[in-house]
Amino acid sequence: MTARPRAVIIGMMGAGKTRVGKEVAHMLRLPFADADVEIEREVGMKIPSYFEEYGEPAFREVEADLIADMLEDFDGIFSLGGGAPMTPSTQHALASYIDHGGRVVYLDADPAEAMERANRGGGRPMLNGNANSRWKKLFKQRDPVFREVANVHVHTRGLTPQGAAKKVIDMVSERAVHVTGAAIEPYDVVIGEGAMNHLVDVLGPKPAKIALIHTQPVQRHSDRARALLRQGGYEVSDIVIPDAEPGKTITVANGIWERLGNEGFTRSDAVVGLGGGAATDLAGFVAATWMRGVRYVNCPTSLLAMVDASTGGKTGINTPQGKNLVGSFYTPAGVLADTKTLATLPNDIFIEGLGEVAKSGFIRDPEILHILEDHAAELRAFDGSTFLGSPLEDVVAELIERTVKVKAYHVSSDLKEKGLREFLNYGHTMGHAIEKLEHFRWRHGNAVAVGMVYAAELAHLIGYIDQDLVDYHRSLLASMGLPTSWNGGSFDDVLALMHRDKKARGNELRFVVLDEIGHVVHLDNPPAEAVEEAFRRIQQ
């Protein structure tokens, strides 16, 4: 059986990778290995001497080979040299390691502290010359790569090595997805039982007041969040909003704005959104608009919110004309998807979240579909009273992680939905129409499930996919208890709403469809008869 590192630590020179890595290994009672030390042992000389005699390209080749071997044959904590992740072959090796469940930790230290440590004692060939200037230049080159390569991001500013090690252990023991991109302030989605315990760490020391926005049904979880916040020294304003879509209105938002004003909330204070997707949508909208933007953290408590609304930076409210027509793109400081909260969900609320999970499998990650197939009966029979600590909890955590990764991939390069991100709307053109015509009595995940069947039927009629893939949509979704048909409205009403869809261009319809599993395309202005015939087929 292949032995793989429990965690791989990367970061800039002076970030404390070796010191923190040794502390992590000590706390977990695991062996520790430093790539630079292993290289010196292998080549029989110090790295500065090797650089001088053979040059950097030769060193990087030796380094890449050693790292590839260690990733396959070392069961402990493994720290890499600062430049190691810049080598393409090492990037591929780390990606493969992550695919097999590995954790690559980007140790992100305060630049001033890291530069000071890196300059101690010399012996760093990459810092020859003006050391601080070289460090800053290397940081500018390497930081984006580190963020891309790692799947765990740990900020260590102000922490002792022991404190940083504890933070690494906490993050590694949970699943985490790092969301970043050109237009995004990077943040982490932490997934696992107890993830909410990171709330104070994510908020940081700056806010004095926290607006805790939540719905009444999640009172048990809001009590826990409030206790954590007060233990952290924050002044907490408890704001209860109507449950589900009725809470996403301008009236509710205005009431919160008035309260924030009356209670003296400033730009340095923060918002925590806790609950289902509607609650996190509204909380994000309030955070984005109060004083042109304050820090906020999402604590989703439903499966749907964990895989959809809480991640990606979309915030918004509904209007009489449609869902989410008023809003903004505004990224959270972090998302804490605590699977402990799922244990309080009724079966039907849990199952609707599987609609968005399946969508991510269809558009990008087929492994999601395989997991859903293998565990469809267990997922359909979900019982919160037996969920925690069960094998199903691990399955669900993996599904959440994979689904969030799909969303992060699309969001990272297209925050404002001008291209790639639109592919996340697979099934949503019809789904949103169903929600509107049903006055939001149909839950979002259920509407999206029917919307995906509609999109599959349309793609088949146009000639993009075969009948087998349409049938697969129906069978997989039905096996989990999701609906695959709808008879609640006329085609004319549906068509009018689809023309109002955000993807529409002028008076032309635009759909997201598959041409194969894992690959989506835009379908612009399809034949009217195909649009109507696909609708007839979901009525059966």
From Swiss-Prot:
Give the record's GO biological process terms: amino acid biosynthetic process; aromatic amino acid family biosynthetic process; chorismate biosynthetic process
Query: How does the annotation summarize its subunit structure?
Result: Monomer.
**Where on this chain does ATP bind?**
G11, M12, M13, G14, A15, G16, K17, T18
Q: Which NCBIfam families match?
A: aroB, PRK14021.1
What Gene3D superfamilies does the record tag this protein with?
A: 3.40.50.1970, Dehydroquinate synthase-like - alpha domain, P-loop containing nucleotide triphosphate hydrolases
Q: Which gene holds the coding sequence for this protein?
A: aroB
Q: Which family does it belong to?
A: In the N-terminal section; belongs to the shikimate kinase family. In the C-terminal section; belongs to the sugar phosphate cyclases superfamily. Dehydroquinate synthase family.
Q: Which UniProt keywords apply?
A: Amino-acid biosynthesis, Aromatic amino acid biosynthesis, ATP-binding, Cytoplasm, Kinase, Lyase, Multifunctional enzyme, NAD, Nucleotide-binding, Transferase
Q: Which residue ranges run through the membrane? A: none
Q: Which InterPro entries match?
A: Dehydroquinate_synthase, DHQ_synth_AroB, DHQS/DOIS_N, DHQS_C, P-loop_NTPase, Shikimate/glucono_kinase, Shikimate_kinase/TSH1
Question: In its UniProt entry, what is this protein called?
Answer: Bifunctional shikimate kinase/3-dehydroquinate synthase
Kindly list the places in or outside the cell where this protein is found, as annotated in its UniProt entry.
Cytoplasm
Native organism is: Bifidobacterium longum (strain NCC 2705)
- List the residue ranges of the region (3-dehydroquinate synthase): 167-540
UniProt KW Chloroplast keyword: no
Where are the residues of the annotated region Shikimate kinase?
A: 1-166
